[in-house]
Amino acid sequence: MEFSQKLYQAAKPIINDIYEDDFIQKMLLGNIQADALRHYLQADAAYLKEFTNLYALLIPKMNSMNDVKFLVEQIEFMVEGEVLAHDILAQIVGESYEEIIKTKVWPPSGDHYIKHMYFQAHSRENAIYTIAAMAPCPYIYAELAKRSQSDHKLNREKDTAKWFDFYSTEMDDIINVFESLMNKLAESMSDKELEQVKQVFLESCIHERRFFNMAMTLEQWEFGGKVND
């Protein structure tokens, strides 16, 4: 079994939990609250900006010009390619995407996720650690979306179905490249090192779950603690 497949197998329980959590279940039914979608889009805008920067940090770690070319293309996709998915949710909210993301948010779950990825990029010379931190994002979106296509709960009369349709196909290229890179880099690593990479991958899967849940709770920093009326 290739290394990437071992990672996916280990991540299955987490992805199952994400699928059963409120965000995805309400998206399937098409009854998710506008406030949750707005908070998700605002936090995701901040996340995607940093995710794009991480692609740039990966480029110097690449040995192949083809890999560099693909990463540059992915930067362009991050800037423009997910516009359709964002617009689908913005239309449900009833505001333009540009108007929604004028309000900047940086919730704890997004903060911790981004810092997890940057730590791998800055502290590890081997690109596999950064890739392992980034790879769960497209992989989990694709897995959730593909699973939705055969789920009777997917409400085709609601616009949220289009969001699932988008991610059921649009992540395949980056997933394949991340798989190829990880499998190639894993060949020269020890079992102990590969276990560390697996840990990085699974931590990002947990961060993905917390990110979706963050939208449902409208998560914010509670610097003053919770006030009990």
Curated annotation (Swiss-Prot):
Question: CDD domains, alphabetically?
Answer: TenA_C_SaTenA-like
Under catalytic activity, the entry for this protein gives: 4-amino-5-aminomethyl-2-methylpyrimidine + H2O = 4-amino-5-hydroxymethyl-2-methylpyrimidine + NH4(+); thiamine + H2O = 5-(2-hydroxyethyl)-4-methylthiazole + 4-amino-5-hydroxymethyl-2-methylpyrimidine + H(+)
Q: What does the record give as its pathway?
A: Cofactor biosynthesis; thiamine diphosphate biosynthesis
An individual GO BP term:
thiamine diphosphate biosynthetic process
Q: Which Pfam families match?
A: TENA_THI-4 (PF03070)
- Tell me which family the UniProt entry assigns to this protein: Belongs to the TenA family.
What is the protein name for this chain?
Answer: Aminopyrimidine aminohydrolase
Which species?
Staphylococcus aureus (strain MRSA252)
